[in-house]
Amino acid sequence: MATNIVGKVKWYNSTKNFGFIEQDNGGKDVFVHKSAIDAAGLHSLEEGQEVIFDIEEKQGKAYAVNLRVK
């Protein structure tokens, strides 16, 4: 698991409860689900919002977890 990755919210759809975070290090965009947002105590994410997160691999896909606002 990669930790303390810095990035910006590329987009988040609050109706569909998911979005993507663009990594500042140029890595692939990372999927973020509402469950990670809820676990962080946040209500939603805004496009361009700076965040710090960990990446967890599940079934070959990367997910943002342990989300924090920068």
Swiss-Prot record:
Q: Which GO terms describe its molecular function?
A: DNA binding
- Top-rank taxon of the source lineage equals Bacteria
Q: Its principal location?
A: cytoplasm
Q: Where in or outside the cell?
A: Cytoplasm
Q: Name one GO cellular component term.
A: cytosol
UniProt domain CSD: residue ranges: 7-67
| Gene3D superfamilies for this protein | Nucleic acid-binding proteins (2.40.50.140)
**Which InterPro entries does the UniProt record give?**
Cold_shock_CspA, Cold_shock_domain, CSD, CSD_CS, CSP_DNA-bd, NA-bd_OB-fold
Tell me the CDD domains matching this sequence.
CSP_CDS
The protein's UniProt keywords, in alphabetical order, are: Activator, Cytoplasm, DNA-binding, Transcription, Transcription regulation
Q: What is this protein called?
A: Cold shock-like protein CspA
Could you read off the lineage of the organism from its UniProt record? Bacteria, Pseudomonadati, Pseudomonadota, Alphaproteobacteria, Rickettsiales
As recorded in Swiss-Prot or TrEMBL, the protein's gene is named cspA
